[in-house]
Curated annotation (Swiss-Prot):
The gene is kae1. It comes from Pyrobaculum neutrophilum (strain DSM 2338 / JCM 9278 / NBRC 100436 / V24Sta) (Thermoproteus neutrophilus). Binds 1 Fe(2+) ion per subunit. This is tRNA N6-adenosine threonylcarbamoyltransferase. Its cofactor is Fe(2+). Required for the formation of a threonylcarbamoyl group on adenosine at position 37 (t(6)A37) in tRNAs that read codons beginning with adenine. Is probably involved in the transfer of the threonylcarbamoyl moiety of threonylcarbamoyl-AMP (TC-AMP) to the N6 group of A37. Its EC number is 2.3.1.234.
Amino acid sequence: MLVLGVESTAHTFSIGVVKDGVVLGQLGKTYIPPGGGGIHPREAAEHHARVAPSILRQLLGQLGVGLSDIGAVAYAAGPGLGPALRVGAVLARALAIRLGVPVVPVHHGVAHIEVARYATGACDPLVVLISGGHTVVAGYSDGRYRVFGETLDVAIGNAIDMFAREVGLGFPGVPAVEKCAESAETVVPFPMPIVGQDLSYAGLATHALQLVKRGVPLPVVCRSLVETAYYMLAEVVERALAYTRKREVVVAGGVARSRRLKEILRAVGEEHGAVVKVVPDEYAGDNGAMIALTGYYAYRRGVYTTPEGSFVRQRWRLDSVDVPWFRDLCPVTTYI
C-alpha cells in the first residue's frame, strides 16, 4: 500500500511517499525569511501554497508513482503555525477527494519519533525530541508516549534561533551559533533553570543577549549558550534513564544534527548502559516521509478519517495522542 504524506507545520513544505512501511522518497522546500528574520505564519503559508504543486509533481515523477496508486493521504495536523498547517490540510483533502481515499491526521511530534525509530531500528527507547518547536523527553507507556520532562516555554531550537537572529548570525540559528562557538576557548556562567523534570529556555537567549551587550566576545557567549542548553537537557535525560532503566535512547528532531549535543547525550547513555541512537540527518528536520510513515502505521490500525472530518490543531500535546501501532513495531519488549 502507498501512503502520501504532507508536512507543512512551520517553515518547511515537504511531501513523502511510503510503500508497505518502507520510505520510497521525499522532497521539500524551506521558507527562508527575508533578512534572516523570524517566520511569519502567513508568508510561510504563501510559500507552501506556491511550491506544493511542483513538489508533488516532481516527487511522483522521480518515484515513478501515479496519483492513482496512492491508497491514503496523511498530513501533519499539528501542532504548528495555523496558516501553514492549513495549506497541508487543504492539499491532503483535495487529493483524498479526487482519489476517493481516506485522510490520516498525524501529530508532528509523534511523526518525528516514528521516523527516528524506523531509521535507527530502536525498539522501546527513551525519546529525546528536540527541534525548533519541541523539547520533550518521553517514553512509551499504556498506549501513548508519556512525557518525563519538557520545556515550560520555548523549545531549545527556538531559543537558539532567537539569539542567532538578534546577533545577526542568520537562520537556521543552531548550526550558526555552534560554528561561532568553535573559536571560543572559555565559557561564562549561565543560569540553568531546571524545574523538577522540566526546562525553561526563554531566559537563556535573553541572558546571552545581555552578555553580548556588556561586551563579552560573541564566540564565548555562543559556546556558553549551547553548552548550558545541552547540559540542561542532558540532566533531564539522565534522570529519566535512572527512572526508566531503558537501554536505548533515540534522539529525534532537527536539533539532533548537532555534533556537540550528540557527544553529550552519548556520554550520558554510556554512564547508564544505554545505547544512544540519533536520527539520520535526512530525517532530522521536518519532512514528508515521517508524515507518510506515521500515516501508514495509523491507517493500518484504523486511525483515519474522511476529508470532511479532517482538521488542524495548532496546539496538540504529544501525550494526548494514542499510538496503537507501537507494539506492532516492537512486539517483544518491556513497557514502563
